[in-house]
């Protein structure tokens, strides 16, 4: 580790590589480690417990050198954060292919993974950490916002005004929760064990206020609910303790969820009954004992959430495998409340809708402002998109390179890609735009406790789909393509793929963008057609998605 090293992406239109494709990969890799973006940049950790951008600093430097030397007809191969080869390919091939954290299934356990990681043979890539397209907490914000909006529509007449949400976790992902709640006019109480993380969300305006006691927190929550005021309150504490205490006191939140780093019982979740400092010491001294405490705390955490559900609260799992750990530890009712995808998001997935994100390689916020306006002109009828973009412009603070996210579906993403490429070509924006997405998408994940939970045909654990997604994106000319294991829910529980593509204003990019931004969301439609979802079948027929065994 280099203790004082600071990495920031270059800005402007001057290249340090041989082409914009390589430059985009370089800048987004560096952006992942920007101190304003990454949770622990000195240890190369971007977000999500131990999700890293490169295996170590030596590997990081070698990746940077490789990208700077890479020709337009070559492809760099990265194996779990380490550059291992450069091969001649062709101009339309990806400039980088990445595989992170992949293990043969029988060996896909945290214990085996950590042993291999300690030996310097692998790293945990999470989703967008090791695939170089993390844009800070905004990256998950709209998904969280849309989930809560769906809850408001289904249960509370379309608004969260006068309703409050109990949740936990203010890390890189969970940090989106307080702002997503207040953007839906609700009140949030978010429990966080790490004061530093809570302060970071205050600094970036995702969180309104922070307190140290449950009494202070509930006074603020009760006042805001009574007055119909949107407010987010951070409470320094341990979720397993606070959730149970609130239930014992007879407090009944309207909504309950959680986004602690429960996917990793050792490096992520902090057990109850000890301070953060004590937990960190135990983690180093006796990892096995730590995991026992952590797992026991997760069981209590889930028991409290089940109790809230039994008492009438709207309770859902936010995809961190908290239920999975509790179930494995012997708590039979762990899955008594649903995951957020089957409960609220799957209808969007059936349309090929998912998190479409883009970043201005220039570093100029004005470029994002121009793309915002152009996108709103492109989709004048999409009121949800207009509402989101306007809210994001007002409320979201950029981290690192200016970026935006919005959820677009099959057909829409290709139109947006063509639009952005034209903006670059016409000089409306000052440098190329990089387009990517989370691995949490409609057709790029196999994750039975999250994205593919409770599939209609029972295909939750089928792992072919993310591999097909990665392969079609690679042959269609994505700028870099990644295949990962264990993101979101932890080692052994998921396979997922990512893609990033550069709009550099060229005619060649027009063709690549059209191909990739059609097939990528198209895989989401196909995957849900195959599972028997009527909504997906209707989309496929209406938009002429060619599926050999579907009667058109």
Swiss-Prot record:
EC number(s) on record?
4.2.1.49
Q: Which reaction does it catalyse?
A: 4-imidazolone-5-propanoate = trans-urocanate + H2O
Name its cellular compartments. Answer: Cytoplasm
GO terms under biological process? L-histidine catabolic process to glutamate and formamide; L-histidine catabolic process to glutamate and formate
Q: Which UniProt keywords apply?
A: Cytoplasm, Histidine metabolism, Lyase, NAD
InterPro entries per record: Urocanase (IPR055351), Urocanase-like (IPR023637), Urocanase_C (IPR035401), Urocanase_central_sf (IPR038364), Urocanase_CS (IPR023636), Urocanase_N (IPR035400), Urocanase_Rossmann-like (IPR035085), Urocanase_sf (IPR036190)
Query: What remark does the entry make about the cofactor?
Result: Binds 1 NAD(+) per subunit.
User: Quick one: which residues bind NAD(+)?
Assistant: 48-49, 126, 172-174, 192, 197, 238-239, 259-263, 269-270, 318, 488
Biological or metabolic pathway of the protein: Amino-acid degradation; L-histidine degradation into L-glutamate; N-formimidoyl-L-glutamate from L-histidine: step 2/3
Q: Which cofactor does it need?
A: NAD(+)
Q: Which GO terms describe its molecular function?
A: urocanate hydratase activity
Kindly list the GO CC terms recorded for this protein. cytoplasm
- Highest taxon of the source? Bacteria
Q: Which residues form the active site?
A: 406
Q: What is its biological role?
A: Catalyzes the conversion of urocanate to 4-imidazolone-5-propionate.
| UniProt-listed PANTHER family | UROCANATE HYDRATASE
Q: What is this protein called?
A: Urocanate hydratase
Species annotation = Herpetosiphon aurantiacus (strain ATCC 23779 / DSM 785 / 114-95)
